[in-house]
Amino acid sequence: MSGIDPKRFGKVAVLLGGESAERDVSLNSGRLVLQGLRDAGIDAHPFDPAQRPLAALKDEGFVRAFNALHGGYGENGQIQGALDFYGIRYTGSGVLGSALGLDKFRTKLVWQQTGIPTPPFETVMRGDDYAARAKDIVAKLGMPLFVKPASEGSSVAVEKVKSADALPAALEEAAKHDKIVIVEKSIEGGGEYTACIAADLDLPLIKIVPAGEFYDYHAKYIANDTQYLIPCGLDAAKEAEFKRIARRAFDVLGCTDWGRADFMLDAAGNPYFLEVNTAPGMTDHSLPPKAARAVGISYSELVVKVLSLTLD
């Protein structure tokens, strides 16, 4: 697909593992990315920042990196800043886009100011009176609700709460993972979708139909009964409109090159954007490879396309 001489990429590090709650997902993503790059003849090597100092990248002659880290310092701008310091080109968003993209609270603030529709929400701080805040939130947002740490990915510690009595405990649990907790009105009736973004590729929307209550960690990475619908069932005009909004939702955060934007539709077909992912999963359950495969792009071709953006 790319027609690029593999030698142009030089020595490439596939960053994988790390120390976040998503370490296992990252290891799985990274191994597949590594194989995909090697299948294309690229000189790619695994590199786990949890086990080796980043300075080794420069010392060992790496000139670019494919970032397959998920969550934590791999996705919040820290790795990106370090790679900038060492002069190593890398896939995905830079410091600002990565930091904002992982922070659901500040993502939603930017979206509210730029006209991107997002579900109504409240924030709770670690150490708040959870019972009192729960009562106030239910009065404002109603039920059901989603409770999620502000800066975790892969649906880590996300809970759908359907009764007011269960909300204080959900807040307490989420606050173990982040000092800021997002409580979001659940958008019901139209289903969940994701828009995969990869440079100039026109990838189809995917409708996600989990067997359980919502698209949680188990549904994303373990279960085999989650349905991924491509085509997504929307008419062409609506799909094009939602892809355009998704791209804008990505761009206004300062995100670049590739990622995902997730959204829900209400019963009337109105979109509500939930979050972006600037370092999306690349496992055999993950969404970008599925979207690419639907338009005839192999896994290896996709990862080479993403890596090729570091040549610009």
Swiss-Prot record:
Source taxon at top rank: Bacteria
Q: Where is the ATP-grasp domain?
A: 108-308
Q: Which GO terms describe its cellular component?
A: cytosol
Q: Which EC numbers characterise this protein's activity in its record?
A: 6.3.2.4
Q: Which cofactor does it need?
A: Mg(2+); Mn(2+)
Which GO biological-process labels does this protein carry? cell wall organization; peptidoglycan biosynthetic process; regulation of cell shape
Its annotated pathway reads: Cell wall biogenesis; peptidoglycan biosynthesis
Q: Where is Mg(2+) 1 bound in this sequence?
A: D262, E275
Q: Is this entry keyworded Electron transport?
A: no
- Where is it chiefly localized? cytoplasm
Residues reported to bind ATP: 138-193
Entry keyword annotation includes Protein transport: no
Instruction: Show the catalytic activity.
Output: 2 D-alanine + ATP = D-alanyl-D-alanine + ADP + phosphate + H(+)
As for family, the record states:
Belongs to the D-alanine--D-alanine ligase family.
What NCBIfam families does the record point to? D_ala_D_alaTIGR, PRK01372.1
Q: What is this protein called?
A: D-alanine--D-alanine ligase
